[in-house]
Amino acid sequence: MNDIIFLNGMRFYGYHGVLAAENDIGQIFVVDITLKVDLSYAGQSDDVKDTVNYGEVYKDVKSIVEGPRSCLIEHLAERIAKHINSHYNRVMETKVRITKENPPIPGHYDGVGIEIVREND
C-alpha cells in the first residue's frame, strides 16, 4: 500500500530546545506529517469517515507543539507520532519531520531538524 496523506509546512511557535534562548524566546517549528493510510475506501465512498481527517490531525499537532516543552525535538516528534498512531486507527505508519529554521546556533543553513518514522502497532 503506497497511499499517503500529508500535511506539509505547518508552522507553530513553541519553546522546545536545550538552550536557554530557545526556552525563553521560543521559535517557529516547521512540521511535516506523512501518514500511510489505505485510501481506497474513501476513494470509493467519498465519505470522510473512511479516511483520516487531516483537519483533526492539524489541531492535534498544533496542540502538542504549542503545549508542554520538550528539551529535544526528537522527543517532540515521538509525542506527535505516538498521539497520531494511538488516535487514528486507519494510520499504518506516521512520519514526522520537524525543522528549526533559525535555531540559536552559529552557521548558515536553511534549517536543522529531525525525521522519524513509526509504525502503528
Curated annotation (Swiss-Prot):
Q: Which reaction does it catalyse?
A: 7,8-dihydroneopterin = 6-hydroxymethyl-7,8-dihydropterin + glycolaldehyde; 7,8-dihydroneopterin = 7,8-dihydromonapterin
Q: Which Pfam families match?
A: FolB
Q: In which pathway does it act?
A: Cofactor biosynthesis; tetrahydrofolate biosynthesis; 2-amino-4-hydroxy-6-hydroxymethyl-7,8-dihydropteridine diphosphate from 7,8-dihydroneopterin triphosphate: step 3/4
Q: Which GO terms describe its molecular function?
A: dihydroneopterin aldolase activity; isomerase activity
Active-site positions on this chain: K100
**Which regions form coiled coils?**
none
User: CDD domains from the xrefs?
Assistant: DHNA_DHNTPE
Assembly and partners?
A: Homooctamer. Four molecules assemble into a ring, and two rings come together to give a cylinder with a hole of at least 13 a diameter.
The protein depicted here goes by the name: Dihydroneopterin aldolase
**What is the species listed in this Swiss-Prot or TrEMBL entry?**
Staphylococcus epidermidis (strain ATCC 35984 / DSM 28319 / BCRC 17069 / CCUG 31568 / BM 3577 / RP62A)
